[in-house]
Amino acid sequence: MPVYAALDVSKASTQVHVVDETGTCLWRGKSLTHPEALAETLAPFANDLVKVGLETCCLSTWLGHELRGRGLPVVCMDARQAHAALSVTMNKTDANDARGLAHLLRAGLYREVRLKGWDDVRLWTLIHARRALLRAQIDVANALRGALRTQG
């Protein structure tokens, strides 16, 4: 029987909601936001999982690649579209968001987003760090120049 799992990711913990093809809740709960813990949480459903969905966020590249490496069929969903669909819910909680994401995943009402490759992420990180260092260097030089300007 096809099973769909949705992850509502936050920094410390992730809300997990698992549904079958009819939308019946098979399991819901929390797990640590770590690929090992999430894979362990989803292990009882691993043979039947059709898709594991998570919204785009700062952790989605890491979690997506790590969970795919553990053999899970991860799909990264566009957060703006998912937010628009989930904004009609009355009680907005992480658990309800995970439930809504699971139903969007099951119905196919989501836009898939490509996860960036590790090489792209590393290059972007280096460029961003270089830009921050240059900005700090310029700020220090300007501060010294301003302090010395009063001395002539």
Predicted feature locations:
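Phosphate- and other anionic-substrate recognition elements at nucleic-acid/protein interfaces
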Residues: M1-G152
